[in-house]
Amino acid sequence: MLFPEKTEFKKRIPKQKFYTNMEITSNLKKAFVEQIKIIYWQNKLTSTTLNIDKGKSVLEIEVIEIKLNSKNLDEMVLSKIDKCIPYHILFLLEYEGMYQAFISYKEIENEKIKVNKYYHTQWLEKEDLPCKIEGLNMDSVYENFIRQIAGAELNVGSEEKKNLKEDIEQAEEKKQLEKQISTLQAKIRKTKQFNRKVELNNELKKLKKMLEKFYSVVLIMVVCVITIHSH
């Protein structure tokens, strides 16, 4: 059992609720129909059911289990469900007894819902999912779910423990830099003109310098851990 018995809700949600009488693309409707077998609202994690303090941003975390027809599910399906339910959601995808946890950094303000990038685990046994309830209030429980599921993807660039939103923005910045570097390297390989090649290489050095800040702190932390264990 992943979560306390007190949090159990166990309500089946007809998948048609997310596409009947709603504006939805044909591709998204097809994904709901073909990729999903059953949707269950398994748990309601609240300050009352978890016996912790309320959060400033997070009132409830809904645990939605989606049984799949295959291992593939389009993320646009999760995004649609996220936008229909005005609470924070932890998704558990199930296929043939194996599970994946999916979660997005979801911002809810003045009834406006913004769903950001999804983080997910590998396929695991249900009891092995990194979804431990950690924190003294609902905000910290939610943030810790994201950090547990995202893992190394959010461990970038600073010795200081920043807030989750800053970490996510920094991880996205790192990803974009890596993408720019990869594109530029491909362009350099194709460029024949010497002057243009020099110009592109200078640009590449600048991007690599910007990327260094994301790795220098990680290296320092590794050295510190090795030093501690050696004494």
Predicted stretch roles:
Residues 25-26, 137, 163, 193:
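Intrinsic-disorder/low-complexity, polar/charged segments
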